[in-house]
Amino acid sequence: MNNGFSTGEEDSRGHTDQTCCLIDDMERCRNQAGYASYSKRIQKTVAQKRLKLSSDPAAQHIYICDHHKERIQSVRTKRRRKDSEDDSNETDTDLHEFPDLYQLGVSTLRRYKRHFKVQTRQGMKRAQLADTIMKHFKTIPIKEKEIITFFVYMVKMGSNKLDQKNGLGNDTT
Protein backbone atom coordinates (compact mmCIF):
# COMPACT_ATOMS: atom_id res chain seq x y z
CA MET A 1 0.00 0.00 0.00
CA ASN A 2 1.55 3.32 -1.07
CA ASN A 3 -0.22 6.57 -0.10
CA GLY A 4 -3.53 4.73 0.04
CA PHE A 5 -3.06 3.20 -3.39
CA SER A 6 -2.60 -0.52 -3.82
CA THR A 7 0.61 -1.11 -5.78
CA GLY A 8 -0.52 -4.47 -7.03
CA GLU A 9 2.42 -6.33 -5.57
CA GLU A 10 -0.08 -7.93 -3.20
CA ASP A 11 -2.25 -8.91 -6.18
CA SER A 12 -0.84 -11.26 -8.79
CA ARG A 13 -3.72 -10.89 -11.27
CA GLY A 14 -2.96 -9.00 -14.45
CA HIS A 15 -4.93 -5.86 -15.36
CA THR A 16 -3.93 -5.63 -19.00
CA ASP A 17 -7.43 -6.36 -20.24
CA GLN A 18 -9.19 -3.94 -17.87
CA THR A 19 -9.87 -0.24 -18.31
CA CYS A 20 -9.91 2.39 -15.59
CA CYS A 21 -13.02 2.12 -13.39
CA LEU A 22 -13.48 5.90 -13.06
CA ILE A 23 -15.96 8.26 -14.62
CA ASP A 24 -14.20 11.58 -15.16
CA ASP A 25 -16.54 14.55 -15.61
CA MET A 26 -19.46 12.32 -16.70
CA GLU A 27 -17.31 10.35 -19.19
CA ARG A 28 -15.91 6.87 -18.58
CA CYS A 29 -12.12 6.76 -18.73
CA ARG A 30 -10.78 4.47 -21.47
CA ASN A 31 -7.19 4.23 -20.25
CA GLN A 32 -5.71 0.90 -19.30
CA ALA A 33 -6.12 0.14 -15.60
CA GLY A 34 -2.95 0.03 -13.57
CA TYR A 35 -2.33 -1.56 -10.21
CA ALA A 36 -3.66 1.36 -8.13
CA SER A 37 -7.07 0.74 -6.61
CA TYR A 38 -9.84 3.25 -5.93
CA SER A 39 -10.23 2.50 -2.22
CA LYS A 40 -12.73 4.08 0.16
CA ARG A 41 -9.98 6.29 1.54
CA ILE A 42 -9.15 7.57 -1.94
CA GLN A 43 -12.86 8.10 -2.64
CA LYS A 44 -13.04 10.23 0.50
CA THR A 45 -10.05 12.30 -0.64
CA VAL A 46 -11.63 12.79 -4.07
CA ALA A 47 -14.87 13.94 -2.44
CA GLN A 48 -13.05 16.35 -0.11
CA LYS A 49 -11.07 17.87 -2.97
CA ARG A 50 -14.24 18.11 -5.10
CA LEU A 51 -12.73 16.30 -8.04
CA LYS A 52 -15.25 15.27 -10.68
CA LEU A 53 -14.38 11.60 -10.37
CA SER A 54 -16.63 8.71 -9.49
CA SER A 55 -16.48 4.97 -9.72
CA ASP A 56 -18.44 3.37 -12.55
CA PRO A 57 -21.00 1.04 -10.97
CA ALA A 58 -20.85 -1.17 -14.07
CA ALA A 59 -17.11 -1.77 -13.60
CA GLN A 60 -16.32 -5.12 -12.03
CA HIS A 61 -13.08 -3.94 -10.45
CA ILE A 62 -11.71 -0.89 -8.62
CA TYR A 63 -8.44 -0.38 -10.49
CA ILE A 64 -7.60 3.05 -11.90
CA CYS A 65 -5.23 4.24 -14.60
CA ASP A 66 -1.89 5.90 -13.90
CA HIS A 67 -3.25 9.26 -15.11
CA HIS A 68 -5.96 9.37 -12.45
CA LYS A 69 -3.61 7.99 -9.81
CA GLU A 70 -1.14 10.82 -10.45
CA ARG A 71 -3.94 13.39 -10.58
CA ILE A 72 -5.28 12.30 -7.19
CA GLN A 73 -1.80 12.18 -5.67
CA SER A 74 -0.93 15.65 -6.97
CA VAL A 75 -4.07 17.10 -5.39
CA ARG A 76 -3.22 15.39 -2.11
CA THR A 77 0.37 16.69 -2.04
CA LYS A 78 -0.42 20.13 -3.47
CA ARG A 79 -2.07 21.10 -0.19
CA ARG A 80 1.03 20.20 1.81
CA ARG A 81 3.25 22.22 -0.52
CA LYS A 82 0.89 25.17 -0.34
CA ASP A 83 0.97 25.06 3.46
CA SER A 84 4.76 24.98 3.49
CA GLU A 85 4.94 27.92 1.08
CA ASP A 86 2.53 29.85 3.27
CA ASP A 87 4.76 29.16 6.26
CA SER A 88 7.84 30.50 4.46
CA ASN A 89 6.11 33.77 3.48
CA GLU A 90 4.95 34.67 6.97
CA THR A 91 5.23 38.28 8.00
CA ASP A 92 6.56 39.71 11.23
CA THR A 93 3.06 40.86 12.16
CA ASP A 94 2.08 37.28 13.03
CA LEU A 95 2.96 37.32 16.72
CA HIS A 96 0.86 34.30 17.70
CA GLU A 97 3.25 31.59 16.61
CA PHE A 98 4.11 29.28 19.49
CA PRO A 99 6.39 26.26 19.68
CA ASP A 100 4.86 22.80 19.65
CA LEU A 101 5.27 21.79 23.27
CA TYR A 102 3.49 18.50 22.60
CA GLN A 103 6.69 17.20 21.00
CA LEU A 104 8.68 17.65 24.21
CA GLY A 105 9.33 14.85 26.64
CA VAL A 106 7.68 14.66 30.04
CA SER A 107 10.97 15.38 31.84
CA THR A 108 11.45 18.59 29.83
CA LEU A 109 7.89 19.69 30.55
CA ARG A 110 8.39 19.00 34.26
CA ARG A 111 11.65 20.96 34.24
CA TYR A 112 9.79 23.93 32.69
CA LYS A 113 7.05 23.53 35.32
CA ARG A 114 9.61 23.58 38.16
CA HIS A 115 11.58 26.50 36.73
CA PHE A 116 8.54 28.75 36.32
CA LYS A 117 6.74 27.33 39.39
CA VAL A 118 3.62 26.50 37.37
CA GLN A 119 0.88 25.07 39.58
CA THR A 120 -0.49 21.74 38.31
CA ARG A 121 -2.17 18.78 39.88
CA GLN A 122 -0.19 15.61 40.44
CA GLY A 123 -0.11 12.73 37.99
CA MET A 124 -0.96 14.71 34.87
CA LYS A 125 -0.46 13.03 31.53
CA ARG A 126 1.95 14.53 29.02
CA ALA A 127 -0.77 16.10 26.85
CA GLN A 128 -2.44 17.71 29.87
CA LEU A 129 0.90 18.97 31.16
CA ALA A 130 1.72 20.40 27.72
CA ASP A 131 -1.67 22.17 27.64
CA THR A 132 -1.09 23.73 31.05
CA ILE A 133 2.44 24.80 30.15
CA MET A 134 1.27 26.23 26.80
CA LYS A 135 -1.27 28.39 28.66
CA HIS A 136 1.52 29.64 30.93
CA PHE A 137 3.92 30.11 28.01
CA LYS A 138 1.44 32.38 26.24
CA THR A 139 1.24 34.65 29.30
CA ILE A 140 4.99 35.35 29.50
CA PRO A 141 5.64 38.94 28.40
CA ILE A 142 8.67 39.43 26.16
CA LYS A 143 10.46 42.52 24.97
CA GLU A 144 11.59 41.45 21.52
CA LYS A 145 13.77 44.47 20.78
CA GLU A 146 15.61 44.13 24.08
CA ILE A 147 16.15 40.39 23.59
CA ILE A 148 17.51 40.80 20.06
CA THR A 149 19.76 43.68 21.12
CA PHE A 150 21.15 41.62 24.00
CA PHE A 151 21.68 38.61 21.70
CA VAL A 152 23.60 40.67 19.14
CA TYR A 153 25.68 42.25 21.92
CA MET A 154 26.55 38.83 23.37
CA VAL A 155 27.52 37.45 19.96
CA LYS A 156 29.72 40.45 19.16
CA MET A 157 31.42 40.34 22.55
CA GLY A 158 31.95 36.59 22.30
CA SER A 159 30.73 36.11 25.82
CA ASN A 160 28.11 33.46 25.31
CA LYS A 161 28.29 31.27 28.40
CA LEU A 162 26.91 28.25 26.57
CA ASP A 163 29.62 28.41 23.91
CA GLN A 164 32.36 28.69 26.54
CA LYS A 165 30.85 25.89 28.57
CA ASN A 166 30.92 23.56 25.55
CA GLY A 167 34.44 24.57 24.59
CA LEU A 168 33.33 26.52 21.54
CA GLY A 169 34.42 29.90 22.91
CA ASN A 170 38.08 28.85 23.14
CA ASP A 171 38.63 28.73 19.39
CA THR A 172 42.36 28.86 18.62
CA THR A 173 42.16 28.49 14.84
UniProtKB/Swiss-Prot annotation:
Residue(s) carrying Phosphoserine: 84, 88
Gene deletion effect: Does not cause cell morphology changes, cell growth defects, cell cycle phenotypes, or loss of Smr/SMRTER protein from the Sin3A-histone deacetylase (HDAC1/Rpd3) complex.
Cellular compartment(s): Nucleus
GO cellular component assignments: histone deacetylase complex
Top-rank taxon, per record: Eukaryota
Keyword Nucleotidyltransferase: no
Span of the signal peptide: none
UniProt-listed InterPro entries: His_deAcase_SAP30/SAP30L, SAP30_C_sf, SAP30_Sin3-bd, SAP30_zn-finger
Region of interest (Disordered), ranges: 73-94
Record flagged with keyword Oxidoreductase: no
MF term (GO), any: DNA binding
Keyword list, A-Z: DNA-binding, Metal-binding, Nucleus, Phosphoprotein, Repressor, Transcription, Transcription regulation, Zinc, Zinc-finger
Family (UniProt): Belongs to the SAP30 family.
Subunit structure and binding partners: Component of the class 1 Sin3A-histone deacetylase (HDAC1/Rpd3) complex (HDAC). Not essential for stability of the complex, recruitment of the complex to some promoters, or the deacetylase activity of the complex.
UniProt xrefs under PANTHER family: HISTONE DEACETYLASE COMPLEX SUBUNIT SAP30L-RELATED, SAP30
Biological role: Component of the class 1 Sin3A-histone deacetylase (HDAC1/Rpd3) complex (HDAC). Appears to be a non-essential subunit of this complex which is not required for cell cycle regulation of progression through the G2 phase of the cell cycle.
UniProt name for this protein: Histone deacetylase complex subunit SAP30 homolog
Organism per entry: Drosophila melanogaster (Fruit fly)
